[in-house]
Amino acid sequence: MQKFLTTAPVVAAIWFTLTAGILIEWNRFFPDLLFHPM
């Protein structure tokens, strides 16, 4: 349990960083799809 408590924040931080980076890159190449998905 102690290992989970120490690794969970690290995994969450990496996951949020990757998600934000993917969204930023997607918005840079396809700026209209985020605002007009249909």
Swiss-Prot record:
The way this protein sits in the membrane is described as: Single-pass membrane protein
Q: Where in the cell is it found?
A: Cellular thylakoid membrane
GO CC entries:
photosystem I; plasma membrane-derived thylakoid membrane
**InterPro entries according to UniProt:** PSI_PsaJ (IPR002615), PSI_PsaJ_sf (IPR036062)
Q: Which UniProt keywords apply?
A: Membrane, Photosynthesis, Photosystem I, Thylakoid, Transmembrane, Transmembrane helix
Instruction: Say yes or no: keyword Transmembrane helix present.
Output: yes
Its principal location? membrane
What is the protein's name according to its record?
Photosystem I reaction center subunit IX
**According to its UniProt record, which protein family does this protein belong to?**
Belongs to the PsaJ family.
Q: What parts of the sequence cross the membrane?
A: 4-24
Species: Parasynechococcus marenigrum (strain WH8102)
Q: Read off the lineage from the record.
A: Bacteria, Bacillati, Cyanobacteriota, Cyanophyceae, Synechococcales
Pfam families, alphabetically? PSI_PsaJ
Keyword Thylakoid (UniProt): yes
Q: What does this protein do?
A: May help in the organization of the PsaE and PsaF subunits.
Gene Ontology process terms (BP): photosynthesis
Determine the domain of life of the protein's source. Bacteria
The gene is: psaJ
